[in-house]
């Protein structure tokens, strides 16, 4: 997935990757 911001709130597949 491609993270558009440093907070990981918006990814390409919409996956919850809020591990920052």
Swiss-Prot record:
Any one GO MF term held by the record is: porin activity
Q: GO BP, one example?
A: monoatomic ion transport
Q: Where in the cell is it found?
A: Cell outer membrane
Keyword set, alphabetical order: Cell outer membrane, Ion transport, Membrane, Porin, Transmembrane, Transmembrane beta strand, Transport
Q: Where is the signal peptide?
A: none
- What cellular-component terms does GO give this entry? cell outer membrane; pore complex
Q: What is this protein called?
A: 39 kDa major outer membrane protein
